[in-house]
From Swiss-Prot:
Gene Ontology MF, one: sulfate adenylyltransferase (ATP) activity
Protein name: Sulfate adenylyltransferase subunit 2
Subunit structure comment from the entry: Heterodimer composed of CysD, the smaller subunit, and CysN.
One GO process term, biological-process aspect: sulfate assimilation
Length: 309
């Protein structure tokens, strides 16, 4: 059979792989938001999900420039590797970066630092930045497989004038039809990666050869154990007297505030090795490594109701 015969036989039977189908869905959502809203912004933490989302957004408008900025809500308690990767990616891609700093709100007396973790304070800073920049839509990298509150959130998630989310009052989403209707002061959070899994994310990173911060791969690091979780020794996070420091080969499955982000023991130093580890994991990355989700059974939902990512 010639190549022409094969093409003729397969004409009309074009099939997308599941990764390309997810990519097409995400690009459709990104373009829909860009067409429907006046001032969208892409929330960018420097983690794997937001890096994949930025990659998709750039691809959605190529060869043109990204028609909206990216915004990092900076707690001031960051992994240095993540900030370096953020700055490098922004410089390479030529996107406009907006940085909203929690420290600015602490200095101005708008929020009070009562606990070591600044993770809860991000909500105030995020909502202030959305309000000051008059953003009417914000892309988030949340996925439904991460956590049960995120599992029930719509792709277009409506937020009222206070930035709050009501999980009992969500709009229906049929097929690929999304309702972005909102009044002045309200906004929409859009989640292009809603239907992706951690395995999908890593498979796409491998397929597209996307560069990530080095802490996503196995490396030697000084850690200590707290509440069954390995935490990194850092200037913003020190062990207690009864928490001995040990050095292990670890990697991070998710990236957030240093004070509440744990790591896992691992020897996976390449994308293919991480994919193999992910395939046999029985815990989501947030369930395994995020102390902020262990506050209560409804910890994430309570924060999202207040305006969290």
């Amino acid at each position: 059979m010639t190549a022409t015969d094969e093409l003729t036989q397969n004409a009309g039977r074009y099939e997308l792989s599941h990764l390309r189908a997810l990519e097409a869905e995400a690009i459709h959502i990104i373009r829909e938001v860009a067409a429907e809203f006046e001032r969208p912004v892409l929330l960018f933490s420097g983690g794997k999900d937001s890096i994949v989302m930025l990659h998709l957004a750039i691809k959605a408008f190529r060869p043109g420039r990204l028609p909206f900025p990216v915004m990092h809500v900076d707690t001031g308690h960051n992994f240095e590797e993540v900030l370096a990767a953020r700055d490098e990616l922004v410089a390479e891609s030529g996107v406009r970066l907006v940085v909203a700093k929690v420290q600015d709100d602490i200095d101005a007396g708008r929020v009070v630092e009562t606990i070591p973790s600044r993770n809860p304070m991000q909500t105030f800073t995020l909502l202030r930045a959305i309000r000051e920049n008059k953003f009417d839509a914000a892309f988030g990298g949340a996925r439904r497989d991460e956590e049960k509150a995120r599992a029930k959130e719509r792709v277009f998630s409506f937020r009222d004038e206070f930035g709050q989310w009501d999980p009992k009052n969500q709009r229906p989403e049929l097929w690929n039809l999304y309702n972005g209707r909102h009044r002045k002061g309200e906004h929409i959070r859009a989640f292009p990666l809603s239907n992706w899994t951690e395995f999908d994310i890593w498979s796409y990173i491998g397929a597209e050869k996307i560069k990530l911060p080095s802490i996503y791969y196995a490396h030697q690091r000084k850690v200590f154990e707290r509440d069954g979780m390995l935490l990194a020794v850092h200037k913003h996070l020190q062990p207690r007297k009864d928490e001995p420091i040990i050095e292990k080969s670890v990697r991070f499955r998710t990236v957030g505030d240093v004070t509440c982000t744990g790591c896992v023991e691992s020897t996976a130093a390449t994308v293919s090795e991480v994919i193999a580890e992910t395939a046999i994991s029985r815990l989501t990355e947030r369930g395994a490594t995020r102390a902020d989700d262990r506050i209560s059974e409804a910890g994430m939902e309570d924060r999202k109701r207040e305006g969290y990512f």
